[in-house]
Amino acid sequence: MESDSVPPSEPFSLIIWMAIMLAINASYYHLLISLVLITLLAFSALISGSEVAFFSITPAQIQDLKESEDKADFRVRNLLERPRLLLATILISNNFVNVSIIILFNFLMNQLLPDSSIQVIAVIYAAILTPILVFFGEVSPKVFANQNNLFLARMTARFFKFLR
């Protein structure tokens, strides 16, 4: 029975084994950390999408924003008046959130798999965390933002106004 707790050496089997071990070892504390990770991933997606949203606004859309009396449009206009500051705010915010995700994920893995080797943790990062961050935190939000730039810019303008 002791051989059941030894992780397999094949990558796919290792991932399945890790998922089973995580489910067995999960507690409310670990589930709470997982919820925080999901929330941070959502923030990363919003922030990442905002970069494309703000900087893909066309001159015609900017003219519409200038003619609008809506408060959200005013905030978007105001943020676009200083594009370098807006870009710096977006990039710093996104880096802060992504680093927080990595630190919290590392903490969670150390709690759930305390005896794992560096190689196992590296496989987890390469096979699980990196694709999740890239796809859900970067690529998908930017595709969405490219097609819904004003919607996302209006939605996140208050947040970036606060951070600025």
Predicted regions and their residues:
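Membrane-embedded alpha-helical segments of inner-membrane proteins
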Residues: 2-164
